[in-house]
Curated annotation (Swiss-Prot):
GO terms for MF: proton-transporting ATP synthase activity, rotational mechanism
Family named by the database record: Belongs to the ATPase delta chain family.
Cellular compartments annotated: Cell inner membrane
One Pfam family matching this protein: OSCP
Membrane topology annotation: Peripheral membrane protein
Organism expressing this protein natively: Thioalkalivibrio sulfidiphilus (strain HL-EbGR7)
Gene it is expressed from: atpH
Principal cellular location given in the protein's record: membrane
Protein name: ATP synthase subunit delta
Amino acid sequence: MSELTTLARPYAKAVFEVAQGAGDLARWSDQLGFMAAVVHDPTMKAFLDSPKLTREAAADTVIGVCEGRIDDQGKNFVRLLAENGRLTLLPEIAAIYEVMRAEAEGKVEALVVSAQPVSDAQKSAIAQSLAKRLGREVELVCEVDESLIGGAVIRAGDLVIDGSVRGRLERMAANLSR
């Protein structure tokens, strides 16, 4: 676990608990996603990293850019992060929050990396199979990586299924070298 994740987790957990208690998981998801995008922008990142910038000015700047996209609770959250020098953690906070939200809603995002594009029928079959195995609704994200040679690698949470030709070749090579 990276240091950023360790620092971001308590903030994500606190926001998640507030959002869940108020039944506002989707609203907070939107706000955190937007704030994270703002802070992740290279120009904004360089501005926020300036040693001459006060924490109050950093908060005011982020709030100003986010005006109309975040509510008063979102603004208070930005101020809290700024006071603690943690504004640049917003992308990690948003990512952790999304994992918590998906868990609470009984969903999981699965990444399918395949050597060739996955057809709609294959997507449906993969999603159904994973949903049965994981006991949750599965949202697929598909990517193509020709270096796999053939097959696919599926990642859903802690589960990794490597059915790629490259993976098989690497396992065979490892077994032969023993």
